[in-house]
């Protein structure tokens, strides 16, 4: 049985979030949550929350044993980029890019 959860338009850089996601891909749920709890990156908190949401979705679908779940797939895609301008000297302006991410996680039972 599979259960999934999706986080869209997260105000996180996709490149930095992929570093966190790569640490938990293929791991069991308890191991993944432990890794994320001690990870200093800002995206670890949101990925952890997303994993807990996917576990709740699995329970809702009727998963018999939550401890047997593992991260089958987890991916980070880039979302739209918010563009802002900051005034600089001599009438110039510099662009500030605020990237967003779409994170998708799929959990499955270990066979």
UniProtKB/Swiss-Prot annotation:
Q: Looking at the UniProt record for this protein, which Gene Ontology cellular component terms does it annotate, in alphabetical order?
A: cytosolic large ribosomal subunit
Query: Recorded GO terms, molecular function?
Result: rRNA binding; structural constituent of ribosome
**Signal peptide positions on this chain:** none
One of the GO biological process terms: translation
Q: Which UniProt keywords apply?
A: Ribonucleoprotein, Ribosomal protein, RNA-binding, rRNA-binding
Keyword rRNA-binding part of the UniProt annotation: yes
Known role: This protein binds specifically to 23S rRNA; its binding is stimulated by other ribosomal proteins, e.g. L4, L17, and L20. It is important during the early stages of 50S assembly. It makes multiple contacts with different domains of the 23S rRNA in the assembled 50S subunit and ribosome. The globular domain of the protein is located near the polypeptide exit tunnel on the outside of the subunit, while an extended beta-hairpin is found that lines the wall of the exit tunnel in the center of the 70S ribosome.
Q: How is the subunit organization of this protein annotated in UniProt?
A: Part of the 50S ribosomal subunit.
Question: What NCBIfam families would the database entry show?
Answer: rplV_bact
- UniProt similarity note: Belongs to the universal ribosomal protein uL22 family.
UniProt protein name: Large ribosomal subunit protein uL22
- Organism field: Geobacter sulfurreducens (strain ATCC 51573 / DSM 12127 / PCA)
Gene name tied to this protein: rplV
């Amino acid at each position: 049985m599979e259960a999934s959860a999706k986080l869209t338009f997260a105000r996180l850089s996709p490149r930095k979030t992929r570093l966190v996601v790569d640490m938990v891909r293929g791991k069991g749920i308890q191991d993944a949550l432990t890794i994320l709890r001690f990870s200093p990156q800002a995206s670890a908190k949101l990925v952890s929350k997303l994993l807990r949401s996917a576990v709740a979705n699995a329970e809702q679908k009727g998963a018999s044993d939550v401890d047997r779940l593992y991260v089958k797939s987890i991916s980070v895609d880039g979302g739209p980029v918010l563009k802002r301008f900051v005034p600089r000297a001599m009438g110039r302006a510099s662009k500030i890019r605020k990237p967003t991410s779409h994170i998708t996680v799929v959990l499955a039972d270990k066979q």
